[in-house]
Amino acid sequence: MFDMSRYFTTIVIFVLIYPILMHSSDDLRANPEVYIGKDRKTQIATGKNYMVVTSDPMATQAAYDVLSKNGTAADAAIAAQLVLGLTEPQSSGLGGGAFALYYDAAKKSLITIDGRETAPISVMGDYFIKDSGEPMSFYEAVLDGRSIGIPGTPALLGALHEKYGTISLKKLIVPAYNLAQYGFLPSEGLSKALKSDIGKLDINPTTRKYFYENNILINHEYA
């Protein structure tokens, strides 16, 4: 018998990561969506059994397909996050951290999972101070790699799946794997972010080749 209760279990994942593509804090204060090139738009949507909301249609489709196959909200969130790490690297990814808020309708319980990234144990208070005694600028720190923390998102997804998942991880990675292996067109938001970061990302040969030399993005390493 089809169990409708699974579709009234709600999950929200907030992904926090130092984006690959960043603007100054002044830009973000004025418009927090500026670095992904998204306009503030309102759209009304309805659903009878379940609903998926992400910032990327491909991630939304991956999660929707999981729910249509009787997967749980946890399964859907994992599939969506794996796709988002590929299609919206300026905002999200396995190299960052996340928080999960999960409501189990059957048990009427709400849980949270802290998967925030952490700083290396060797980091001290002078980590972002130059030899001259001056603090690094924002971009000096980011491009130097010192702003990268120890990822927490993979552990969070693993804990979420262990407790609430019903579909194997091997199946949940398929949408992201196919996109990474065979390619996808960058979204409008990613395209705008890449354009705004010309002069930064294209300095590095690896990011230049991946983001700027092909219209279709293929990421075999991610796959």
Regions found by a protein language model. Give the residues of each.
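Bacterial N-terminal signal peptides that target proteins for export
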Residues: 2-11
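Bacterial N-terminal signal peptides
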Residues: 10-19
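Sec/Tat signal peptide C-region and signal peptidase I cleavage site
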Residues: 21-23
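Noncatalytic scaffold domains of N-terminal-nucleophile
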Residues: 25-61, 65, 73-74, 78-223
